[in-house]
Amino acid sequence: MTEKNTTIQNVRAVTRALAILNSFAGKNLQSLAEVTLGTGLDKGTTRRLLLTLMDSGFIMQDPATQHYRLGRAIRDLAANVADDLDLKAIALPVMTELAADLHITAFISVYDEGDTVCLDRIHDMKGIEVHWWAIGGTLPYNCGGAPKLLLAYQPPQEITRVLKRPMVAMTPKSVMDVTEFRDQLEKIRRRGWECAVDDVALGLTALAVPVLDRNGDVVCCISMAGLTPQMVSRGRPVHLARLQAAAEQIERRLKQ
């Protein structure tokens, strides 16, 4: 095979791979048949290219449904386009207002390969200092509202991978049983929020909700923390509606 022919084949492969990635525009999950239909490629070529893209992290596959979705490599590249999507700049004013109104500590956090990273926090708990989660810091995946919520929204294979890591007991209330924790994650995903009581620090409760993009994927988590009597009443989170409204406000701004 000549060098010219090799170059042509390589260009064709790249073009086809890009067609597969572009077929996910506006779509969260696709079957093999849907990708084939969307690209006009034959099934064998589509399958081979999907496997190659999976190896590179550009595509992920749900083992339960065998459907495909965009992978973390796409999100990592997108994260570098700061001018197009400055998440912190959009979310911070909303969370600052929330913290000032309710006198709580508000957090903006993102998922990163099994860790939940605090992008920013706004502290307005009068007379009370909170130091457990610094900006840029992480929390154990089994403790706190944001870590559990963000993990609950990950694909099943990612949850399984993370659960191979040791759990950490920050307080006696921290969940340390894998089966119990899996059940907790399923419940969080179904209801769309998490209220974590006393599992990071005794006497403190965190409430967390997701911020979703137009495809229903999690962009970040916004959460608030305060004294348990301030956050929970009769077993229910007091400020859930307010936090969900803040998430919806951020979602609208992200879509503009």
Q: Predicted regions: what is each one?
A:
Residues 26, 124, 213:
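Short, conserved catalytic or interaction motifs in soluble domains
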Residues 10-14, 67, 71, 84, ...:
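Short, structured helix-loop boundary elements
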Residues 1-89, 96, 248-256:
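N-terminal helix-turn-helix
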Residues 151, 158-163, 169, 247-256:
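Cysteine/selenocysteine-centered motifs that mediate thiol-based redox chemistry or coordinate metal-sulfur cofactors
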Residues 141-144, 234-256:
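Short, solvent-exposed cationic patches
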Residues 173-246:
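Extended hydrophobic
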Residues 65-165:
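Amphipathic alpha-helical effector-binding/dimerization core
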